[in-house]
Amino acid sequence: MSNTENNNAKRLPVGKDISTRRRIARARRHDRIRKNLRGTAETPRLVVHRSSRHMHVQVIDDIAGRTLAAASTLEAEVRALEGDKKAKGAKVGQLIAERAQAAGITAIVFDRGGYKYHGRIAALADAAREGGLKF
């Protein structure tokens, strides 16, 4: 066994495929981020969950344990939209901004859920900012 193969064998847990390792790494990142984020009634937490096809966004008051507003790509308004996932993410960002403002929320804390601030996540955040939410 060469040095490179030996190093790779040490790094990869037995029985763990790439998708499992990525899921575990994302969960660790999310835990690390969540240590410093707390949503309140004045500045609730905007949480993003992303799957391969859809996105779900919630505005949560962590102290009361309540969801104040929510939006998803599963809604008919977003499903009817033509375009790629980034366009649908931006539409979800607009929807959550409208619903949050209707609930009297203007400032939020952004919880990206351990995902990179890139692509769909960035499009959603930018659209929410343009919709009037302060991060």
UniProtKB/Swiss-Prot annotation:
UniProt keyword Ribonucleoprotein, yes or no: yes
GO molecular function, one term: 5S rRNA binding
Record-level GO BP terms: translation
Keywords: Ribonucleoprotein, Ribosomal protein, RNA-binding, rRNA-binding
Gene3D superfamilies cross-referenced by the UniProt entry: 3.30.420.100
Coiled coil ranges: none
Matches recorded under InterPro entries: Ribosomal_uL18_bac-type, Ribosomal_uL18_bac/euk
Cellular component annotations (GO), alphabetically ordered: cytosolic large ribosomal subunit
The UniProt record lists the keyword Hydrolase: no
Annotated Pfam families: Ribosomal_L18p
Signal peptide: none
Protein function: This is one of the proteins that bind and probably mediate the attachment of the 5S RNA into the large ribosomal subunit, where it forms part of the central protuberance.
Family classification: Belongs to the universal ribosomal protein uL18 family.
Record text on subunit structure and interactions: Part of the 50S ribosomal subunit; part of the 5S rRNA/L5/L18/L25 subcomplex. Contacts the 5S and 23S rRNAs.
Protein name: Large ribosomal subunit protein uL18
Source organism of the structure: Corynebacterium diphtheriae (strain ATCC 700971 / NCTC 13129 / Biotype gravis)
Gene: rplR
